[in-house]
């Protein structure tokens, strides 16, 4: 299968190794991977801030870039939800609605693609350590991705997966929320990191890099040596 990658801004700018590891995993499974250079932001920041006209401009560009893709895989539940759930809403009743729905139908968050599209649970990974998983809000609530990441992690050799208390609670990032309400954002993050600390985990894993960046910053401030790791970075290890 030819898989086209939709790489979120945070991965592109701050965590490119996570995108490269998705390529590594998909090629290990026998798939061809394509990365269109013309892709850009999914448009979520203006959409969430109420600038829907501006968000449509960005979304239209993305729809054009991925128009001919067989299947689109994205390394973020947040950006994945933007495409799968909110693109059709953004263009509801407009000429581009059909194209928005078409892109939504062929777009998958990475763990969803592996488990529910390909039927793969074991990618041959080995990652020694004790880890806990953080559910990003959009991936969990908009895409329903509670099980797929955990199913994949349960098949990673030498990985001890422990559930943190209230794993589904927001880390406090929320995109522009962290900028508009920094004190609330930090307080929410501190609650999340307290749950992390209780597990005694060496690693905090998530399928959203933005959540991991928020958690990493607070853990560093608290002096907690636990490391944040994207799901793809775990699954790429052998």
Where are these regions (language model features)?
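Iron-sulfur cluster-binding electron-transfer modules in prokaryotic oxidoreductases
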Residues: 1-238
């Amino acid at each position: 299968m030819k898989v086209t990658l939709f790489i979120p801004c945070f991965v592109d700018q701050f965590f490119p190794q996570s995108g490269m590891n998705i390529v590594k995993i998909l090629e290990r499974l026998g798939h061809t991977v394509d990365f269109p250079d013309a892709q850009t932001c999914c448009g979520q920041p203006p959409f969430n801030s109420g600038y829907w006209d501006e968000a449509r401009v960005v979304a239209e560009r993305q729809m054009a870039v991925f128009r001919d893709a067989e299947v689109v895989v994205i390394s973020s539940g947040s950006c994945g939800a933007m495409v799968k759930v909110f693109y059709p809403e953004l263009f509801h009743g407009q000429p581009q609605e059909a194209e928005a729905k078409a892109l939504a139908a062929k777009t998958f968050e990475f763990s969803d693609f592996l488990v529910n599209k390909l039927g793969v649970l074991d990618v041959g990974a080995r990652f020694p350590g004790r880890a806990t998983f953080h559910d990003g809000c959009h991936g969990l609530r908009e895409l329903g991705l509670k099980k797929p990441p955990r199913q994949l992690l349960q098949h990673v050799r030498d990985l001890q997966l422990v559930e943190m208390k209230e794993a589904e609670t927001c880390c406090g990032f929320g995109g522009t929320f962290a900028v508009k309400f920094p004190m609330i954002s930090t307080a929410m993050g501190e609650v999340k990191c307290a749950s992390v600390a209780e597990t005694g985990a060496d690693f905090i894993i998530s399928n959203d890099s933005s959540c991991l960046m928020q958690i990493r910053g607070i853990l560093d401030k608290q002096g907690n040596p636990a490391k944040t790791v994207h799901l793809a970075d775990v699954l790429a290890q052998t």
